[in-house]
């Protein structure tokens, strides 16, 4: 009788143990789908793996559309000496590129350090301008162009002032002096030609202080007068030769 009583009790305990083991081995059969996902996330967190997101939820951070970048690069190339847009220009670029104002500002901040120096070096300009702000770079460019204008025009003005007295050497003729006759002495001719040079030096000093007041009428072309002087000198030399020949027959 005791063996018969022990038999059913043992079978019950065995069945309970088997059921407990089955529940432990297969927990997914008794749990909901939400619990399954939570268990998977916990397991991934424990192992250090990040669950893969669907493709339509993936976003590329830090990359702008190629068309928008092309528009911004074209604008920077046209305004490379003032390579930072104003607020109105930012709004205009925002409409064209469909980007926000902060995206445009960040792009220009990075592009002025990375893209603009190479762009200016290809054009043969100084890449240091690209590191300055828009207004400062534009002001420095204007100052450099303004400073280069008088530097170029200065020597030309002095050359013109120095070259003018050379053409106006016989200025004394306009003051009433007469052309030397062929029979006059050579010393007198030299004094006549030397006197305008002294006057020219005085006019040269005044013209350096105010070169714009020099009139073109005072410095007319006296090439015909030079021809007359040369002819007179030649005639005087011929007369002297004739006198020497007459004195020594």
Swiss-Prot record:
Bias (Basic and acidic residues): 9-27
Ranges where the record places region Disordered: 1-62, 126-192
SMART domains with a match to the protein in the record: HOX
SUPFAM superfamilies in the cross-refs: Homeodomain-like (SSF46689)
Keyword DNA-binding (UniProt): yes
GO molecular function: DNA binding
Zinc recorded as keyword: no
Descriptive protein name: Homeobox protein TGIF2LX
